[in-house]
Amino acid sequence: MRRPFKADAPVKEGPRANKEIRVPRVQLIDAEQNLGSIPIDQALRMADEAGLDLVEIAPNSDPPVCKILDLGKLKYANQKKAAEARKKQKIVEIKEIKMRPNIDTHDYEVKMKAMNRFFEEGDKVKVTLKFRGREMAHQELGMKLLMQVKDDTQEIAKVEAEPKLEGRQMMMVLAPK
């Protein structure tokens, strides 16, 4: 016979408030000043009289520091702050630009334009040069091309990984300054 599923008790997020604070004394701060160390029941009564909540600010201190404030406003402010932090967060991606050692000048300019756009967006760029057939005998052309890319982007980007040969391709990683 199957046992019924019993979910874990929900974990409460945020600071403890009012009756959840289970210590004999607290360091109390109200809107104006620090009221010092007082018994928890007196602190709860003062918060109730003010029509606000007793919120634990620093639970690890001895005695815990509590403040009389509106818990709803505190939670709202914390949510706003977290949303703002998420909005500002940018995940750095590595974009790849593929070239050949004998790339034409216009094609090179188009690739450089794309590379500059990636740097403006704050992304890293991995420049990959693919050698085919007998092109492997002329690796100096590939190195020369990667050095040209490095020189053309030195104002807006820095080299994160120097050009190196891996199998039939040469690669270099650039990061925005």
Swiss-Prot record:
Record's protein name: Translation initiation factor IF-3
Recorded GO MF terms: ribosome binding; translation initiation factor activity
Function according to Swiss-Prot or TrEMBL: IF-3 binds to the 30S ribosomal subunit and shifts the equilibrium between 70S ribosomes and their 50S and 30S subunits in favor of the free subunits, thus enhancing the availability of 30S subunits on which protein synthesis initiation begins.
Keywords: Cytoplasm, Initiation factor, Protein biosynthesis
One cellular component term from this protein's GO annotations in UniProt: membrane
InterPro entries assigned to the protein according to its UniProt record, in alphabetical order: T_IF-3_C_sf, T_IF-3_N_sf, Translation_initiation_fac_3, Translation_initiation_fac_3_C, Translation_initiation_fac_3_N
Subunit details: Monomer.
Lineage top rank: taxon: Bacteria
UniProt family annotation: Belongs to the IF-3 family.
Single GO biological process annotation from the record: ribosome disassembly
Main localization category: cytoplasm
Intracellular or extracellular location(s): Cytoplasm
Species in which this protein is naturally found: Rhizobium meliloti (strain 1021)
